[in-house]
From Swiss-Prot:
One of its GO terms (cellular component) is cytoplasm. The keyword Amino-acid biosynthesis does not apply. The lineage of its organism: Eukaryota, Fungi, Dikarya, Ascomycota, Saccharomycotina. Keywords: Coiled coil, Cytoplasm, Phosphoprotein. This is Bud site selection protein 27. It comes from the Eukaryota.
């Protein structure tokens, strides 16, 4: 208490010294302000002498003509008179506020010191405490005798010190308390409201002291728990002797068949706890009332003991086996001499307890969870917490394979057996051919057969009449293939003779020439021309483009082939008429597909064609033909000339000059809505082939390149104003440019200082320590833009 009072006194002294210093400084600045006011008046009057050489007042220097304010470290700045007066006024205001705060602190320190002094002088209060102790429950010694089962046999309550009777204590206290109360009443009238508050605070402190006071029980004669245990062990050794653990045998059957009622013991424990509560915090005042209350408790205990005794006698009448087996007197004497030992039974019964671990986990949740989640989790948990033996899990732990799995020893045999069976099934299985391919093959055979029949008939008739002609034509068989290709040659000659030079290749043309009887008849009738053909063979072989077989033909768009000189030949105009009519008829019949596929079977067909047809075709290819006196040219295509004229290119494309690089069968061409029916039928037939093609040729996806770089903005060029045209002025020092640079620099510094202030402010650290969460316990995320905006709004 003395140390606390001394610290309060030192604090009070420091506060008073600071207040006195501030009051002195306040008077000093008031004097400075008055001098500044007079200094202004003197200047207004025009007096330049002033106050001599000038004066120094700490932070302010007043000279004859100027006023200076201190910046610290002996640096001064010139100020005007008005600025100096405002500076002094601010200083005076701050000093007055500080003096008020010190006055409040000094008053509080004085009150605290008065309270401490009043507590030291509280002798009368201690006497009141001694008198008030009698109102509380006196300390007493309670002794109870217990039987073997823990029941109370007898109890006694004795006070530690003799308590005077309540009547005598009241008589002794009344004369002493009377004058004190009168004196206190007079003092209360003279005390102020604050002193009354001090008295209330003292009463509260007194109550705390009364509760904390130590008990008056004699601790030397009180038994501790260790003493009680030691005493009980000694008593057991005297009664039973020292028993070894090997000699102890428990009769578990008797223990299971016995009926123990534990509820009574729990009730007694509860009653004992209630009694202890009553003893510690008694509601009944006075010693006599307390003693009568304890007597009633003893009476109730005696009644309860008698009831328990009667109940035990009724239970003893029943035939129950004792827990410990009875032994003879000799065995008891031997056991007393031996040491105590503890043994274990040979067989035990194990009772399984339900595992509630998963259920407890589900119940321990710190946050509210939606109902649908709990239902799902409980359903799964109930399945997992079943007590049934999981044989599959046990088998997996042992490494046992499932019934469907095959052992590694027999896997190779099974794989070989499956491979042999697959090969056998493939050999026995018929090769599947789509109906679409069958139809195509059948159409080819039919067209070839009809074509052969017609050609053989026409040729046989002519061969019988003109045998010598056949002998001259047999020599050049390969030319037939080239003659077969040139359908458009003769077809276009009928329409316009000059156009024949631009057209070379069209496969179906010569097939029609071979089929027509009049054509062969006309060629065979003119023996001199055929002889001319035979004589001019070397010249044609060297220059004609028809000498190459069909498979070696290379005609590409916009590529000029080798040119050949035109051959003159007398030619009958009836041939052109027959060829032109038949050409258009064949296009209507739809034999284009067959004629386009002739390139594959060309070698086979040449062997089967009659020799007369081959000779006639060779003669037409090697020699020129004449219509009257005018020669018919063999057509040559000038691809470079076609490239310059779009109309000619379109016409050549429609005639099929560019079809040499196309596939044999383009497939179904969809030109109308009705064509989709045929297309869908073919899709159904070729479903397996389409699937295989899609698996073999997977589409290649092109990955888009991602470019995270900055996107270039448009560059805006500003024209220089007229003021920049002056060479003497620098562009960087122009007022507009300077203002722009100042604004940019100010913006940058403002952002830097704001970020630095946010990082260094303690509020930012405290906000970072707390993480907001929702009702389910998930963290709530806020954007940085939103948090910065809220933070800037919250700033003053």
């Amino acid at each position: 208490m003395d140390l606390l009072a001394a610290s309060v006194e030192s604090t009070l002294k420091n506060l008073q010294d600071k207040r006195n210093f501030l009051s002195e400084q306040r008077e000093h600045y008031i004097d400075i302000r008055s001098r500044l006011v007079r200094f202004i008046n003197d200047n207004d009057d025009g007096e330049e002498e002033g106050e001599g050489q000038g004066m120094v007042f700490g932070d302010i220097i007043i000279s004859t003509s100027k006023i200076y304010l201190s910046l610290g470290y002996e640096y001064y700045v010139e100020k005007t008179k008005e600025e100096a007066i405002t500076f002094v006024d601010d200083k005076l205001k701050l000093m007055e506020d500080a003096i008020e705060q010190f006055n409040l602190k000094i008053e509080e320190a004085k009150k605290t010191l008065d309270n401490l002094n009043h507590m030291e002088d509280g002798n009368g209060i201690e006497e009141d405490e001694a008198n008030n102790d009698e109102d509380f429950l006196p300390s007493m010694e309670i002794r109870e005798e217990l039987d073997d089962e823990g029941n109370v046999i007898s109890s006694s309550v004795t006070p530690t010190t003799k308590q005077p009777s309540q009547s005598n204590s009241k008589k002794e206290q009344t004369p002493a308390v009377g004058p004190k109360e009168k004196g206190l009443a007079k003092e209360k009238k003279s005390k102020s409201f604050e002193e009354n508050l001090k008295g209330k605070l003292l009463k509260r402190n007194d109550e705390v002291k009364k509760k904390v006071q130590p008990s008056k029980v004699d601790t030397e004669n009180v038994y501790t728990f260790a003493d009680l245990v030691q005493q009980m062990d000694q008593q057991d050794e005297l009664e039973d002797g020292y028993i070894e653990t090997d000699e102890i045998n428990y009769d578990y059957d008797a223990f299971e068949n016995s009926n123990f009622k534990v509820n009574d013991n729990y009730e007694e424990d509860d009653e004992d706890e209630d009694e202890e509560e009553y003893l510690n915090h008694s509601i009944i005042p006075g010693f006599e009332a307390q003693s009568s209350f304890l007597q009633q408790i003893q009476r109730l205990r005696a009644q309860k003991q008698s009831q328990d005794h009667e109940r035990e006698e009724g239970d003893v009448n029943k035939s129950l086996k004792p827990i410990l087996k009875k032994s003879s007197f000799a065995e008891n004497s031997d056991k007393k001499q031996k040491k105590k030992q503890v043994g274990f039974a040979s067989s035990l019964e194990i009772h399984e307890v339900e595992n509630l671990k998963e259920e407890n986990k589900r119940q321990m949740q710190s946050f509210a969870v939606p109902m649908y989640e709990t239902q799902e989790s409980t359903g799964i948990a109930n399945k997992m917490t079943s007590d049934e033996f999981d044989g599959d899990l046990f088998a997996k732990m042992l490494g046992v394979q499932e019934a469907d799995e095959v052992h590694e020893k027999y896997k190779e045999e099974l794989i070989n057996q499956e491979r042999l069976e697959g090969e056998a099934s493939r050999s026995n299985r018929r090769t599947r051919v789509s109906r679409f391919r069958k139809d195509r093959a059948s159409k080819k055979e039919n067209t070839l057969s009809t074509f052969k029949q017609e050609t053989t008939r026409s040729v046989e008739n002519e061969v019988v009449e003109k045998e010598p002609v056949v002998g001259d034509i047999i020599e050049k068989e390969p030319v037939v293939g080239d003659v077969i290709e040139k359908e458009p040659v003769v077809g276009d000659v009928i329409e316009k003779e000059p156009a024949v030079t631009d057209i070379v290749e069209r496969e179906p043309a010569v097939n029609d020439i071979v089929e027509r009887k009049p054509v062969v008849g006309d060629i065979i009738e003119k023996e001199p021309t055929i002889n001319d053909i035979v004589e001019k063979e070397p010249e044609i072989n060297s220059k004609s483009e028809f000498e190459t077989p069909f498979k070696k033909k290379k005609l590409k768009s916009l590529q000029k082939p080798r040119s050949s000189k035109s051959m003159k030949k007398k030619f009958d105009p009836k041939i052109l008429e027959n060829i032109s009519d038949d050409d258009y008829d064949d296009d209507d019949d739809g034999n284009k597909k067959l004629l386009s596929n002739k390139s594959k079977n060309n070698t086979d067909e040449q062997d089967k064609f009659p020799s007369k047809i081959q000779e006639v075709s060779r003669s037409m290819a090697k020699t020129g033909a004449t219509v009257g006196s005018e020669p018919v040219r063999i057509t040559n295509v000038d691809y470079h000339a076609l490239g310059g004229n779009l109309d000619d290119m379109v016409k050549a494309y429609s005639l099929g000059l560019y079809d040499d690089d196309l596939e044999e069968d383009p497939g179904t061409i969809v030109e109308k809505l009705e064509d989709f029916k045929e297309y869908n039928k073919q899709v159904e037939l070729l479903r397996d082939e389409i699937r295989d093609f899609q698996l073999e040729n997977k589409p290649v996806t092109m990955e888009e390149e991602e470019n995270d770089g900055n996107v270039m903005n448009d560059i805006i060029e500003h024209e220089f104003p007229e003021s920049y045209t002056n060479d003497e002025d620098e562009v960087a020092l122009h007022p507009g440019r300077l203002q722009e640079e100042v604004a940019i620099e100010y913006r940058r510094l403002k952002e830097a200082t704001a970020s630095k202030w946010q990082s260094s402010s303690p509020a930012a650290h405290t906000e970072g320590e707390l993480e907001p969460i929702d009702k389910f316990g998930n963290p709530v995320k806020t954007s940085r833009f939103r948090s910065q905006r809220l933070h800037m709004d919250s700033k003053p």
